[in-house]
Amino acid sequence: MKKRLLPIFFLILLTFGLALPVSAAENSIDDDAQLLTPDQINQLKQEIQPLEEKTKASAFIVTTNNNTYGDEQEYADHYLLNKVGKDQNAILFLIDMDLRKVYISTSGNMIDYMTDARIDDTLDKVMDGMSQGNYFAAAQTFVQETQAFVDKGVPGGHYRVDSETGKITRYKVITPLEMVIAFAAEIG
């Protein structure tokens, strides 16, 4: 009797588990500074969803006009830590109207996709919208640039430095030449 009930239990659990909606993108926009319209927020949530699905990471767009930390990096890092926890996959784009700065914070696998150079490139492109006061365009650019870098993959020669311990972790990416050599060695 128990052997027949166990598969039924798992079938019911699986059925209801798959029926629950994914709401990761639902909490992705925190517009405390009220820079975006409700329609713009909904559109950004839709644009964020494919990025979150591909990277298995949370993506956040946060606006504030009351930075209690006095530093955009500290504000963004604490926000991310409170939302997802330490070393979980996430990226955050902060528009800080209090300090008049923008910042991108990464955690988990997003550190590998969004290197410092890629973040700088993204922030340069975001500044076009920011300088015109078009915060929606700036947020869209952030999502589009992040998605483009994710599509390119983790760059070769990438490494991480743990800010607490100073430990360096290098990541090896197999080049096309190495793939050909490995394939030739396998068939030869």
Where does each model-flagged region fall?
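Selective detector of the "anchor" transmembrane alpha-helix that sits immediately C-terminal
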Residues: 177-188
